[in-house]
């Protein structure tokens, strides 16, 4: 896997996070880091001043067809398009910031995202992985008390079923 460089935008919002939050590109797989870099753009599309968990989730689901996040959800019996629509509906209901004649730049990590990223450390240990991957981001999102648990519940995807799907896609079933 190639090494991607951090964009200034990603570096800014990630630097605002707490000390125990992984924020260096070198700690992520390429696909996971790609989602982290896309999340601020997703947040901006929804007029959010903060990058939050739903923005990372949507960035994961908007990755090219055949992406790992979609394969995991499909393995769990959830259509990725449905998951994306649910996350978009959630994001559309959140407070928005508007700038006359301009666009909002989402450059700060929200509290739930900071918590979710901290959770990725536990997920990487659970699977004994060196790098934070798409699977870890999905698993940590499902634990998010702000919106992840609600979205996953609406999709009929409890934690045990998600973990089983991750294990199966990883070839550990």
Sequence positions of predicted segments:
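Histone-fold recognition with a strong bias for associated Lys/Arg-rich disordered tails
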Residues: 2-173
């Amino acid at each position: 896997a190639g090494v991607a460089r951090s964009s200034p935008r990603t570096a800014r919002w990630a630097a605002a996070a707490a000390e125990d939050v992984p924020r260096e590109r070198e700690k992520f797989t390429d696909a996971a880091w790609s989602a982290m870099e896309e999340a601020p753009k997703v947040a901006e599309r929804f007029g959010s001043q903060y990058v939050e968990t739903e923005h990372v989730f949507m960035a994961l689901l908007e990755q090219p067809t055949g992406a790992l996040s979609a394969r995991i959800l499909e393995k769990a019996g959830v259509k990725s398009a449905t998951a994306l629509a649910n996350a978009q509906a959630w994001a559309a209901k959140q407070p928005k910031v508007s700038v006359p004649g301009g666009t909002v730049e989402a450059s700060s990590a929200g509290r739930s995202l900071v918590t979710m990223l901290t959770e990725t450390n536990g997920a990487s240990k659970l699977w004994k992985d060196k790098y934070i991957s798409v699977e870890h981001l999905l698993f940590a999102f499902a634990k998010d008390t702000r919106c992840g648990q609600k979205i996953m519940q609406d999709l009929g995807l409890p934690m045990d079923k998600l973990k089983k799907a991750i294990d199966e896609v990883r070839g550990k079933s």
